Amino acid sequence: MVFDTEVYSNTGGQSSKSTPTGAIAQFAAGGKETKKKDMASIAMSYGYVYVAQISMGADFNQTVKAIAEAEAYPGPSLIIAYAPCINHGIKKGMAKAQTEEELAVKVGYWHNFRFNPAAEGNKFSLDSKAPSDGDYQAFLTVRFVTTL
């Protein structure tokens, strides 16, 4: 299980390989110039790794299903969990992290999915819905504000 905070959280929110392009973080005050490393795509490219992206605040049932499938899978499994960090500058604080997770999926920033190489038929399941009326740009604008 990888808790993807998109920064090095234990050192004050420094830019990492998981930080999205353009994000402002410590040591990337002008915005990160390189692309975020897509761990899920890398693992899926092997063809034999169970991979899921989850966001518990957006879909608790999908989270539980992904964890159960990963545990039952007879090979390596990788679950990447969207994990808001205090360094994101969540307006109402970390008490609203679950709401932030829900919003990330709602606006299309984060996608919940499962890739199960052992599944019959389609091995990839996109579990999140198409982005709805959320404001993607507003979601991005408030992230990483504490580093300014």
Task: Indicate residue ranges for each PLM-predicted region.
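Conserved thiamine diphosphate
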Residues: T19-Y73
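Glycine/aspartate-rich loop-and-adjacent alpha/beta segment that forms the canonical ThDP
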Residues: G57, T63-L148
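Acidic, glycine-rich active-site loops and adjacent beta-strand->loop/helix elements
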Residues: V2-S9, M56-F60, P84-C85
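Noncatalytic linker/hinge segments flanking ATPase motor cores
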Residues: G12-T21, D38-Y46, G93-K96, P117-A130
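Catalytic or ion-translocation cores adjacent to nucleophile or general acid/base/metal-coordination motifs
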Residues: M1-A28
